[in-house]
From Swiss-Prot:
It comes from the Bacteria. This is Nucleoid-associated protein PD_1058. Binds to DNA and alters its conformation. May be involved in regulation of gene expression, nucleoid organization and DNA protection. One of its GO terms (cellular component) is bacterial nucleoid. It is found in: Cytoplasm, Nucleoid. Belongs to the YbaB/EbfC family. InterPro entries: YbaB-like_sf, YbaB/EbfC. It holds the Pfam family YbaB_DNA_bd. It comes from Xylella fastidiosa (strain Temecula1 / ATCC 700964).
């Protein structure tokens, strides 16, 4: 019984170290989302901080289109960050299953 608890504690410590490393990697990550055939692109960090917005000069006179494309590009980038985060955090949990709805990072 003690061996099982010690092993579980070692696994938990290893998982915590892996999660910390994955969070640090995500903070450095940059993901690009685009919309309108790349007329608008948004670069987000792995923590969903907006780093840059690029707008093709050919659409600068169409405010409504710009607004729609920025929102779509942001959502595209956000979905990519979520997918990357899920993948990295999943491998950081050492295959341990987490309860449904349990989000990482904490």
């Amino acid at each position: 019984m003690r061996g099982n608890i010690a092993q579980l504690m070692q696994q938990a410590q290893k998982m915590q170290e892996n999660l910390q490393r994955a969070q640090e990697e995500l903070a450095k990550l940059e993901v690009t989302g685009s919309a309108g055939g790349s007329m608008v692109s948004v670069i987000l960090s792995g923590t969903k901080e907006c780093r840059k917005v690029r707008i093709d000069p050919s659409i600068l006179n169409d405010q409504e289109m710009i607004e729609d494309l920025i929102a779509a590009a942001f959502n595209d980038a956000s979905n990519k960050v979520d997918a990357e985060s899920k993948e990295r955090m999943g491998s950081a949990t050492l295959g341990m299953s987490l309860p449904p709805g349990f989000k990482l990072p904490f």
